[in-house]
Amino acid sequence: MPLPDFHVSEPFTLGIELEMQVVNPPGYDLSQDSSMLIDTVKNQITAGEVKHDITESMLELATDVCRDINQAAGQFSAMQKVVLQAAADHHLEICGGGTHPFQKWQRQEVCDNERYQRTLENFGYLIQQATVFGQHVHVGCASGDDAIYLLHGLSRFVPHFIALSAASPYMQGTDTRFASSRPNIFSAFPDNGPMPWVSNWQQFEALFRCLSYTTMIDSIKDLHWDIRPSPHFGTVEVRVMDTPLTLSHAVNMAGLIQATAHWLLTERPFKHQEKDYLMYKFNRFQACRYGLEGVITDPHTGDRRSLTEATLRLLEKIAPSAHKIGASSAIEALHRQVVSGLNEAQLMRDFVADGGSLIGLVKKHCEIWAGE
């Protein structure tokens, strides 16, 4: 399928996707019932969409195009209410978190969807292992060239986004010692990590043509980069965050990305170059492994800085942009989180350290999601 022209969209508009866990009490393992839930709620959703993801234990909640985080929060809240009622009617529960702490990938059923079945054919067991749960944020752009500039600008802050959203310390019944273990699942995919370097939209079109020769790439959706342009929506999509345990944190993360995009495209503070990516995977690893306690390295100067310090600097830089787009509450909440030193991964570990089981941890996550 050829790459579509870049669809011009209103700059800085938002679209947010949350991949949720469908679990089966009282054992709180992943259920295989997302199709049943989707059929139940499909005529009750008035704004946004509830849809499939890769496997039957995943339920995606997606907003419509939103002008700001308040509109997105309203749509999510309405969807949450409908989904929770449908889940209760079927004796199921819903929760966030980037991984389910003890599910076995071999049990996961790939959805009966042509694209997912084709992906299963291409990637085999890797697709079942990709039963992990992330938050994706789309930001509108006025042109393809703006999208490429924005993608490179946001890529500088991938470690910050990972560290702030880290919520996947447990996997396959084990403490991984990572704050965010979810991104590691994709390391075997040939398109893992950053997009190959291009400097404008014309070069991106040439890149896509080249990748399509592999026969594994039929559309932009088949590319699993950390950040990718979405020409059919006219957006740049950030894909590195774990699904948070609460809607409020998900909305705050979206506000952070929206405000950062506003700052990048209005101030144009960087002249991007390929060398910007020299330390990308090392800095990304630091964020996944240590969260805000990680240390990132500047590829140009060699300077090293903790992610706590770097994130506070980012929040300060984008505060004026956040004010202009109505996202100040998100930046203030994230500032409090960074200063407190707490993140969801550590809260999960604290629960287990205090004697809680992994089954009890999932139960707690369901209570958090339902109780907000």
Curated annotation (Swiss-Prot):
Q: What interactions and quaternary structure are annotated?
A: Homodimer.
Concerning Pfam families, the annotation shows: GCS2
What superkingdom heads the lineage?
Bacteria
Q: Which GO terms describe its biological process?
A: modified amino acid biosynthetic process
Summarize the protein's role. ATP-dependent carboxylate-amine ligase which exhibits weak glutamate--cysteine ligase activity.
Q: Tell me the protein's name.
A: Putative glutamate--cysteine ligase 2
What are the protein's GO molecular function terms?
ATP binding; glutamate-cysteine ligase activity
Which EC numbers characterise this protein's activity in its record?
6.3.2.2
- Its catalytic activity? L-cysteine + L-glutamate + ATP = gamma-L-glutamyl-L-cysteine + ADP + phosphate + H(+)
**Keywords attached to this entry:** ATP-binding, Ligase, Nucleotide-binding
Organism annotation: Escherichia coli O81 (strain ED1a)
Return the InterPro entries for the record.
GCL_type2/YbdK_subfam, GCS2, Gln_synth/guanido_kin_cat_dom, YbdK
Gene name, per UniProt, is ybdK
State the family named in the UniProt similarity comment for this chain.
Belongs to the glutamate--cysteine ligase type 2 family. YbdK subfamily.
